[in-house]
Curated annotation (Swiss-Prot):
One of its GO terms (cellular component) is cytosol. Belongs to the SHMT family. The record marks H225 as: Plays an important role in substrate specificity. The keyword Nucleus does not apply. It comes from Bacillus velezensis (strain DSM 23117 / BGSC 10A6 / LMG 26770 / FZB42) (Bacillus amyloliquefaciens subsp. plantarum). Its cofactor is pyridoxal 5'-phosphate. It is an enzyme of class 2 (transferase). It is found in: Cytoplasm. GO terms for molecular function: glycine hydroxymethyltransferase activity; pyridoxal phosphate binding. PROSITE patterns: SHMT. This is Serine hydroxymethyltransferase. Disulfide bonds: none annotated. Gene3D superfamilies: Aspartate Aminotransferase, domain 1 (3.90.1150.10), Type I PLP-dependent aspartate aminotransferase-like (Major domain) (3.40.640.10).
């Protein structure tokens, strides 16, 4: 950076401090990742200056011939990655992508079947504090109390009983593979639309390491960050028959001008996904999550469902006598960033919780391998089991520092 340090030292210093935080801490928030320098360059380009309401070839502003090229590249690459018939890359977020699907096919008060937030769902899947739960009549399904896997028979029974217009699959804190074929069969049985929110697993789907929902779902939404390792944003994939309605729901329905600099960054990240080494990255994300899970098990720490099939691990802290709120703070103090998270049938309040959620997408981008994740699990065990012992916590800090120094981040940024 050449101009920002001179123009606005306050903002520059905050950015520099965040750069330092990312370098010196271990990032285990499952919804975060580290984009490449190329993605950051695209997002910081002159495209931030351009208004482009509408879609390629049908804009409400002149001078869009070059941003049209960029948006077409993003759409075509997404189609190639996921085998989708129609793609909209304009949603500013995953939440807005979900909203657009709802606005396309639902009326106020329609019944929708979605996953309980405390069982691993998402706010936009019917939480009463979210527009989705206010606007529509959401019925919740969840996981089996014993296995902590999605209870597909419960999904079917509720679908038959409530006859939803839409069934939503996908989660923000579910560590197991989702059977989209079963969901499709249930949706067909009751005549419902089927939508999948694959925000957390999109990168794993892209690499062929998780079943692809596109052949089964009428609509698939996702964020473009998380395991997909792009800029923060959203995307919708759907059958061609719904394409025009989806596009209208985004613009002019719920958004104005698209963020063309972000769409450029999406295009670049999609290009990276199409490269051969992305599959290796995604394989490492999963193997690292399994290494972390095994290490935590060795520490005697209980995991929801006993382990993981994807990029995240959900920790049940009750046997340690800790809440998620306390554990998040303890780990942050030693240099590990995580988030408190509800577990299925959680007795604690949402701002307290009985669990923490850990993910390996970001540390894998940084170069952490299985041995490093085994060490991370051991450090977490040390800190949580001795959270009131300052000597043990200092040992944990030193071990975190050794790992972050071994795997540097953004070495060429220059600030």
């Amino acid at each position: 950076m050449k101009h920002l340090p001179v123009q606005d030292k306050q903002v520059f210093n905050a950015i520099k401090d965040e750069r330092k935080r990312q370098q010196t801490k271990i990032e285990l928030i499952a919804s975060e990742n580290f984009v490449t320098e190329a993605v950051m360059e695209a997002q910081g380009s002159v495209l931030t200056n351009k208004y482009a309401e509408g879609y390629p070839g049908k804009r409400y502003y002149g001078g869009c011939e070059h941003v049209d090229v960029v948006e077409d590249i993003a759409r075509d690459r997404a189609k190639e990655i996921f085998g989708a018939e129609h793609v909209n890359v304009q949603p500013h977020s995953g939440a807005q992508a979900n909203m657009a699907v709802y606005f396309t096919i639902l009326e106020h008060g329609d019944t929708v079947l979605g996953m309980n937030l405390s069982h691993g769902g998402h706010l936009t899947h019917g939480s009463p504090v979210n527009f989705s739960g206010v606007q529509y009549n959401f019925v919740e399904y969840g996981v089996d109390k014993d296995t902590q896997y999605i209870d597909y028979e419960d999904v079917r029974e509720k679908a038959l009983a409530h006859k939803p217009k839409l069934i939503v699959a996908g989660a923000s804190a579910y560590p197991r593979t989702i059977d989209f074929k079963k969901f499709r069969e249930i949706a067909d049985e009751v005549g419902a639309y089927f939508m999948v929110d694959m925000a957390h697993i999109a990168g794993l789907v892209a690499a062929g390491l998780h079943p692809n929902p596109v052949p089964y779902a009428d609509f698939v939404t996702t964020t473009t960050h998380k395991t997909l390792r792009g800029p923060r944003g959203g995307m919708i994939l759907c059958r061609e028959e719904f394409g025009k309605k989806i596009d209208k729901s985004i613009f002019p329905g719920i958004q104005g001008g698209p963020l063309m600099h972000v769409i450029a960054a999406k295009a670049v990240s999609f290009g990276e996904v199409l490269e051969d080494d992305f599959k290796t990255y995604a394989q490492n994300v999963i193997s690292n999550a399994k290494s972390l899970a095994e290490s935590l098990n060795k520490e005697g720490i209980q995991l929801v469902s006993g382990g993981t099939d994807n990029h995240l691990v959900l920790v049940d802290l009750r046997s340690l006598g800790l809440t998620g709120k306390v554990a998040e703070h303890v780990l942050d103090e030693i240099g590990i960033t995580s988030n408190k998270n509800a577990i299925p049938y959680d007795p604690e309040k949402p701002f307290v919780t009985s669990g923490i959620r850990l993910g390996t997408a970001a540390v894998t981008s940084r170069g952490f391998d299985g041995d490093a994740l085994e060490e991370v699990g051991a450090i977490i065990g040390l800190a949580l089991k001795h959270h009131e012992d300052e000597a043990k916590l200092e040992e944990a800090r030193q071990r975190v520092s050794a790992l972050t120094e071994k795997f540097p981040l953004y070495k060429e940024l220059g600030y």
